[in-house]
Amino acid sequence: MKKGLKITAIALGVLLLLMLILPFAFRGKIESIVKTEGNKMLNAQFDFRSLDISLFRNFPKASITLSDFWLRGVGEFENDTLVQAGEVVAAIDLLSLFGDSGYDISKIQIENTRLHAIVLADGRPNWDVMKPDSTSTDTEEEETTDDSPFKIQLQRFVIKNMNLIYDDRQGNMYADIRNLNALCSGDLGSDRTTLKLEAETEALTYKMSGIPFLSNANIYTKMDVDADLANNKFTLKDNEFRLNAIQAGIDGWVELKDPAIDMDLKLNTNEVGFKEILSLIPAIYAKDFDGLKTDGTATLTASVKGSMVGDSIVPQFDIAMAVKNAMFRYPSLPAGVDQINIHAEVKNPGGAIDLTTVNIQPFSFRLAGNP
């Protein structure tokens, strides 16, 4: 009995020692491959402070971690950092470390990331960093892809604490996403799978033509998506969506084509109180929102159907909000706002964004008894 325990202890000790030593043996080889493949594929500057391999972090998978990774453009974008990440972690098959047939990547995790996407006034984006290969045929391109030592067979993709800025100077659109956390799981290596997605951003600001549509909005979503990866069509199944205090569901589908994105989506809200509508106003949502007293009825509907092509063509959309005989008051104030009646609608028949119409009729209220 004692002899068996001793042998087991020795075996475990040897195994742990190997798990500590082996990463050092493979680190130089994999670091060289990462830099070689990066230079082969990217027309950009990139580097990282260190590359580490661990057999513990995602056991029984091996983990490759790039610390302080950054990617910067060239030419006009050479001073603009596209991506800066504290850590980029890839989980690979452990046995692939001992062969030359490549490394199967089943999980990617990105932590503490800043992403700055820019579209110049002439339409050039700073994320167009892949080297062109205009001389290759489709068959040659497939062979080149197959020859890559890294095989993407993702089962899990994780984002932790990402800050993202999208600055479209041609389309006059701007988005600022703060503290985005997201998890996506599913068999991304198959033609069809069910993706399980959960994401939340602490603060989203969105402007179009200088007009703020969202300001520091808190957004959360959890959904199952029927993903037809062979045809790039994604159909929403069970899902929940929250925008500040408004909870809703989204029905429909999105299909990625080239260059269009086809869609048919509808926002479903079972019941929306006036207080939930007020959560869309940043100054109200940020100050004593829980103690705010409200009354009245409200409805919110939204739908979008058609094709979006770049910044020039938008799908048909219709967003409508109605408030009837509503009121709100802070407990600390002597008077509130009552007899609030609003009907607002934003519509576009599809096509140019300039065809968008905004109609607000009526918009009336009383403040401390005064209309």
Language-model regions, residue ranges each:
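Elongated, acidic membrane-bridging lipid-handling scaffolds
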Residues: T113, D133-K233
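Amphipathic hydrophobic-ligand
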Residues: M41-R49, E76-I92, I105, Q170-L183, ...
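Flexible, solvent-exposed coil segments and beta strand-coil junctions
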Residues: D68, K160-N163, E202-L204, L229-K233, ...
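Outer-membrane beta-barrel translocator/pore domains, especially the C-terminal barrels
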Residues: Q109, H116, D262-S279, D295, ...
